[in-house]
């Protein structure tokens, strides 16, 4: 299972975003993990675009076919997850989208011993409107609770 939050932009009216409309209409979606080399393309695709705009083209990215879902994945993404929609929960003005991952796409050079090498992936994230990249990987000892 996987979940994402889709909410209105602070600078826009609280209408349904194209992302949420597309997921609800299609019943499926793709999550592409953004790594540092794709940061500018991610930022470009996060802007406000007309509903039928080609965001792949605007961001300089290549759509690639998926194996299970109809939606395209980002060819340049090091990790992509094809998902089937389980449900959407409205929480205030935000929506929690819950999906079941049905297919992973992972670049060979990132996959070691049955796991994704997060240090090589260099994933990006959002924290309170700012961006962050994973730089330090560490383990904590397992505890019995």
Segments and roles (model prediction):
Residues 1-145:
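Basic, polyanion-binding surface patches
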